[in-house]
Amino acid sequence: MRNTIINRRFKYTDVNATSILIIINVVVFILQNIFTDLPYILSMVPVYIKLKHWYWQFFTYMFSHVDFWHLFSNMLGLFIFGRIVERSVGSREFLLYYLLTGTLAGITSYFLYLYSGSIFTVVLGASGALYAIMLLFSVLFPNAVVYVFGIIPMRAPILVILYFFIDFFGQFKADGTAHLVHLSGLLFGILYITVRMKINPLKQWGIMK
């Protein structure tokens, strides 16, 4: 069957987009600590999008972080999983996947927060896109073992499933974590992998035959 525009593959390139993304995130973090209003401009705040039409926040929220440890944990995850995924699928595919899943996770979360009345919620961080990257890593390397906290061995698919349940039940608690963004990142990651890459994650994980 001839490829459509949805699943047409890019020519393989490797320009280390992972490092570029990390650098951008670090630069933004430095700037937002110099210009104190910048986090509210870049973060996704539903009331600003609704009333001020700041639609760029659907994209920019994933480059803004609340503090150093938030930035460090996300960039560490991106460094660990991102480079391997990028080398496997190519830089262009990697960037499209990362930016698209992150943006769609932001848009979906916006409508869910709007529906729930949480319009003053401030959403920021690369976690939605990072969850999608972890998902793709687990699909490409289903037998890979990840050491949680550096000591607990766990197969990559098990880790992703564990994170899913943590965020699913975590959304019912007011703990300041954007669980909806995490879950949306996983959802759009699954759709991207299934529709564009024509890979069934459950088959890759050995759950389905």
Language model features: what each stretch is:
Residues 1-209:
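A detector for small-residue-rich transmembrane helices and their helix-helix packing motifs
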